[in-house]
């Protein structure tokens, strides 16, 4: 729907709300989904290789661990809902993932030499991700930023795989 715009710019029409939602889902949301989950896979894989299978307990800040445990408890207390995943990393927000990478950048640097640039790029999509995640309309510049980070992250994953870095799903 190339002509779809933010429904809030028009007189209320439920069809415009649906069209805007479909547009965001088809053009933006799936890329954010991929970005966040590719970061999870890379972080898990690299930290498992560098620290070991118990990397979460060793390499993650206790404050992040506590936040994740609260989020996990929310799902445990409502078993009629699905859960984000088995590993704690699936309960971590994008901002948490960035903090984990920052705190362990020395472990990422041998595999991803420009890790500091990647941390900055993740920060560039954090707020646009929240806009989309909270069901709002992203600005054109934010959509373009998401497009570029998604494409570049796909390339990084391919480079890691080609270099022999084992990538595994947490």
Predicted regions and their residues:
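Amphipathic alpha-helical interface elements
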Residues: 1-170
